[in-house]
Design a protein with these regions (language model features):
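Conserved acidic residues
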Residues: 71, 142, 171, 196
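Conserved beta-alpha
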Residues: 85-168
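Short gly/pro/ser/thr-enriched loop/turn and capping motifs at secondary-structure boundaries
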Residues: 80-82, 181, 204-209
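Short, flexible loop segments at boundaries between secondary-structure elements
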Residues: 146-152, 196-232
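A transmembrane-helix-recognition feature enriched in membrane-embedded lipid enzymes
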Residues: 79-84, 215-265
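Proline-aspartate-enriched helix->loop->beta-strand connector
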Residues: 165-174, 179, 195
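N-terminal nucleotide/polyanion-binding subdomain common to many enzyme families
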Residues: 2-99
């Protein structure tokens, strides 16, 4: 893929969703773009957006900056697709972060890309690496690390992590720390640790490592993955899903109204 090809992909596949730049790409197109990024060797960040992250990007200027400068922002949530469709901005494919990670690891095994897993609880990233190397023969996981709680406030620990990543020789970094911590870590450090592609992957390491049970595929396909997570931890997640996330509909109505006034709907 040439620079010209890259610009065509980006310019033709970008949509504005509630003021958030989304790349309207299939998983296969993302994989192909990643190949280009690895060959280019300029550090980039790839992130996904669900309702919770969309609200953070809308309401927090720094998060908006991070997502606006990301190489790819993919849609990781059925509600985002439903709202975008009603705004006459149909999204061609929901790209689930955990599913994308598996596809990326499959391709990494085929193309001899090296990966590094950062995040999750003690031992989880190790188990995830073991499972991935078993499922994708030839995959090279060159390192795993689970940072201690509060690592981002410890300069020595941060220096240790960045040095570890820089010396790893990895082509891709999968970070599972939850948002916004994982997004901020990548954004502020990727140029220093100099790994071509870094991904904010949330709970993907937990799913692959087996520490958290993922929702059945039928629930994910029908936009009910959030409900599965809620049933696993209702006390902690009730406010998030039934109070905080409801604010997305306010922003949706405001955006839709402004688009109608501008004659774009």
């Amino acid at each position: 893929m040439t620079e010209k090809d890259l610009k065509i992909v980006d310019n033709r596949k970008v949509i504005d969703f509630l003021g958030i730049r989304l790349n309207n790409m299939t998983a296969t197109e993302i994989l192909d773009h990643v190949d280009y990024c690895i060959e280019r060797k300029t550090p980039v960040q790839i992130v996904g957006v669900n309702v919770d992250q969309a609200l953070r990007v809308i309401e927090d200027k720094y998060s908006h900056q991070i997502f606006d400068e990301a190489e790819i922002v993919f849609t990781d949530g059925k509600p985002i697709m439903w709202m975008a469709d009603r705004l006459k901005r149909p999204i061609i494919e929901k790209v689930s972060g955990p599913d994308l990670m598996l596809l990326l690891c499959e391709r990494a095994a085929q193309k001899n890309y090296k990966i590094f897993l950062l995040g999750a609880g003690p031992g989880v990233a190790d188990k995830a690496a073991e499972n991935l190397e078993h499922d994708y023969p030839g995959l090279q996981c060159v390192g795993t690390y689970s940072p201690p709680f509060g690592f981002e406030r410890d300069p020595e620990e941060m220096k240790k992590i960045v040095t570890m990543l820089k010396d790893s020789g990895a082509d891709q970094l999968f970070v599972g720390m939850g948002s916004p911590k994982q997004d901020i870590f990548i954004y502020e450090n990727m140029k220093e640790y100099n790994i071509p592609v870094s991904y904010s992957m949330g709970a993907a390491l937990d799913f692959i490592g087996g520490s958290v049970k993922r929702a059945p595929k039928w629930m994910s396909d029908h936009g009910l993955e959030w409900f599965h997570r809620f049933t696993q931890n209702p006390k902690r997640l009730f406010k998030r899903y039934f109070v905080d996330d409801m604010k997305i509909f306010k922003y949706y109505r405001l955006f839709k109204q402004s688009e109608k006034v501008a004659g774009r709907l």
